[in-house]
Curated annotation (Swiss-Prot):
GO terms for cellular component: endoplasmic reticulum membrane; mannosyltransferase complex. It comes from Cryptococcus neoformans var. neoformans serotype D (strain B-3501A) (Filobasidiella neoformans). Its EC number is 2.4.1.-. This is GPI mannosyltransferase 2. Belongs to the PIGV family. The lineage of its organism: Eukaryota, Fungi, Dikarya, Basidiomycota, Agaricomycotina. Coiled coil: none annotated. It is an enzyme of class 2 (transferase).
Length: 423
């Protein structure tokens, strides 16, 4: 019998994880009463996938943008859900698409995207580190501390587009295709604009390490058009959607009647910050209250590993640059990691200081650095050469991480099925 490749094993494990998780959620939703009846506003017998933000996603995908608070969500995933719903309608030979078609279609796409994202993460990690590191990263990725990969949420497809963009950029050197993937990610989540940093830095620095550049090279950057065009491609979907919201909520008729929304008088009239602040209480330090301490505690394992991983990476980056300048040997990290860790720092800062911090548990799915940090901190000898599996040992932090993701993942499934907080 032929030995299965690591990629095949990961594919099988990812598919089994989706089947198992969907089965568990289905059973739990039948056994648990809904703590909040919001899902019943859309369907009298809501499926387990219809919880929290999925309620908004399904509503907009089916009815379009009806209310101001809904423009907090980028339109990309909602369009995918609608298209998937049309596919379900076609398969069941119905004349009109129904809300349940949209929910089922979105659930299928999200689960397929999660499996695909896991495979792309393995291939990306294998090229940057080594096969053992990549295998462990993928296995940890299949133990997320959230139930959202099984639901019609933005994270799975956002992760797939982001990982694919990084892979196409750093491994295949396909800048245009990478830019399209990153732009697609921005249509899914507004944080996709951070990927413009990765693309622009790669266009400027290429395979050079940032500390190896001569000061004259920085002066040349201002004369280059390509990096800025790349960045515009990635951020364009965000501003295009803001223009759309302006045309809907800031019409001349509404302005004449003095009934236009307050943000319409801003220059430029951007709705995003206003809506996030008014309806979702998102803003600098808005979440820093005593009552939210439990939610900070939930995100602490990721925040702690992020801090430790960032300090370790940039310390290595600086020290490797210094020894190279002195002629001694120390292998510096691959150049692409500087961009990815920089984006990681921005993302974690946004989650810690501005957002609902507990969403770190699901936003982490789209950030490969989170999972690389977990492997670096949780396993010994994993970055040495090819790192044969027999030489790699799980340490105390690794056991804690695995235990935490398993236990909290199970708790999160129960909370999700019963529509219990936190979201």
């Amino acid at each position: 019998m032929a030995k299965l490749s690591p990629l095949t094993l990961i594919f099988i494990a990812a598919c089994l994880s989706r089947i198992l998780h969907l089965t568990i959620l289905s059973g739990l939703s039948k056994a648990l009463p809904l703590f909040d009846t919001s899902p019943s506003l859309l369907l009298s017998s809501p499926p387990p996938a219809l919880r929290w933000d999925a309620i908004h996603f399904a509503s907009v995908a089916y009815n379009g943008y009806e209310y101001e608070q809904q423009v907090a969500f980028q339109p990309g995933w909602l369009a995918v859900m609608r298209l998937a719903g049309e596919g379900v309608r076609f398969i069941r030979a119905a004349s009109v698409v129904e809300l349940k078609d949209v929910i089922l279609g979105g659930t299928i796409v999200a689960n397929v995207a999660f499996v695909a994202a896991t495979l792309v993460l393995y291939k990306l990690t294998k090229h940057i580190f080594n096969p053992t590191f990549a295998f462990l990263t993928s296995l940890l990725y299949l133990l997320p501390p959230t139930a959202t990969p099984s639901a019609p949420y933005t994270e799975p497809i956002y992760s797939l587009l982001t990982f694919s963009g990084i892979y196409l950029l750093s491994i295949k050197r396909q800048m245009v295709l990478a830019g399209l993937c990153f732009a697609g990610a921005t249509t899914i989540r507004s944080t996709g604009i951070f990927n413009s940093i990765t693309l622009m830095c790669f266009a400027v620095f290429g395979d050079a390490h940032i500390f190896d550049l001569d000061p004259k090279d920085y002066c040349k950057i201002r004369k280059k058009l390509k990096p800025f065009l790349s960045a515009i491609l990635v951020v364009a979907p965000f501003f295009m959607f803001q223009h759309y919201t302006e045309t809907v909520f800031c019409t001349r008729e509404l302005k004449r009647a003095s009934t236009a929304r307050p943000w319409c008088s801003n220059s430029p009239p951007v709705s995003y910050g206003f809506v996030q602040k008014l309806y979702w209480n998102v803003g600098p330090f808005e979440y820093w209250t005593v009552s939210q301490l439990p939610n900070f505690a939930l995100a602490m394992p990721i925040l702690f590993s992020s801090l430790a991983g960032v300090v370790k990476f940039f310390s290595h980056l600086v020290s490797s640059s210094q020894v190279l300048n002195h002629g001694t040997e120390e292998i510096p990290p691959p150049p692409i990691l500087f961009e990815l860790y920089s984006v990681h720092v921005l993302t974690m800062a946004l989650l810690l200081f501005t957002s609902h911090t507990q969403i770190t548990l699901r936003v982490c799915l789209g950030d490969p650095v989170v999972w690389w940090n977990a492997v670096k901190l949780g396993f010994d000898n994993v970055q040495i050469g090819e790192a044969p599996m027999g030489q790699v040992k799980v340490n105390k932090f690794g056991r804690y991480w695995i235990g935490w993701t398993v236990v909290w993942g199970a708790v999160a499934a129960v909370l999700w099925a019963g529509h219990y907080p936190p979201a």
